Swiss-Prot record:
MF (Gene Ontology): (4S)-4-hydroxy-2-oxoglutarate aldolase activity; (R,S)-4-hydroxy-2-oxoglutarate aldolase activity
Lineage: Eukaryota, Metazoa, Chordata, Craniata, Vertebrata
Protein's recorded name: 4-hydroxy-2-oxoglutarate aldolase, mitochondrial
Gene Ontology CC terms, in alphabetical order: mitochondrion
DNA damage found in the keyword field: no
Amino acid sequence: MFGRTLFPARVIALGSGLFRTPLRTLAAGPALSIGGIYPPIATPFTDKEEVDYGKLHENLQNYSSFPFRGFVVQGSNGEYAYLTREERLEVVRRVRQAVPKEKLIMAGSGCESTQATIEMTVEMAQSGADAVLVVTPSYYRGKMTSSALVHHYTKVADHSPVPVVLYSVPANTGLDLPVDAVVTLSQHPNIIGLKDSGGDITRIGLIIHKTKHLGFQVLSGSAGFLLAGYSVGAVGGVCALANVLGAQVCELERLCLNGRWQEAKELQYRLIEPNTAVTRKFGIPGLKQAMEWFGFNGGKCRSPLLPLTEQEIKELRHIFTVNGWLSL
C-alpha cells in the first residue's frame, strides 16, 4: 500500500541533526527513536493575552535539569487551537533555538483539512521540528471513518519532510483513531508512532501487539497510565503533569525501564490524582495554576478559557497536598 513515498532513496536531514530515510523495513525498526518523556509545554501569555516568549524561555531553562527526551510543542496543552498560524510557528522556532539539539522537538501540526495540515507540517519542519504530532481532524467527525483518516494521514505523511506521529485524543476531539486505521498507517514508512491519550490500556496493548514487528512506537498520552503503558510495551509518554512534576514523571519512567515495578507502582499511585486534576478535572487553567506553585510560568490562558475560581484553586492545591507534593 505504501510502496512509493515522496522521498524514495533519499536521506532527510532533521532539525536535531538526526537523519532518516523513509524506506523502513520490517527488520530495521524505527529510524528515529522517540522513546522517553515529553512535557507538552504550555504557552505563557501576557496580561494582554499575547504570547510571552520571555516566560516560555524561562520555562525551558528550568526544564533543562530534567532528563526529558524532548518537548511536544503546540499540542493540546499549548492551546494551539487559540493561536494564529504564525504564532504556532514562532513558538516552535523559539523552542528549537532555546533547547539543545539532542532534545527532540515534536510539533503539533494538525489542522482540520488535509491540505492545511500538509502546509503546517512542512512549515513546522522548516521551523525546527524533528517530528510532527498530527491530531485527528474532528469537526466533521461523523464522516471521519477509518478510510477517511487513512487517506488523510497518508497524504500528510507522503508530503512531510519529517516523521509523523499520529495523535488520538478523544476527550478533546470526540474521536478515537480506530485500531484498524492505526495498524494500516503503521505500515507507512514515514509514520513512526502514535500518541494515545484515551487511556484504554487494552486498546494500547492491542495496537502495540499488531505493530511492534514494524518498529512502530506508542507513547502513553498521560502520566495517569504511564506505568500501565510501559507494562504493555509503550516506549514513553507525553505527559501534561511533566510540566509540573517533571522529575517525578521521569523517575517513574526510570523505575519502569529498570523493572522496579513495586516502587513504580507506589509512585504511580501518587501521580494519578494530580494528573487527573491538571487534565480532565481542571484542564489547562489547572495545569497553569499548578505550574506557578512549582516555580514555572503558567500564567493566564487565552480567552475564552477562564482562570480557576478560588474554590477550584483550593481544591487543586488540596489534591497536590494529600499526595505529598505540596505542604499546607
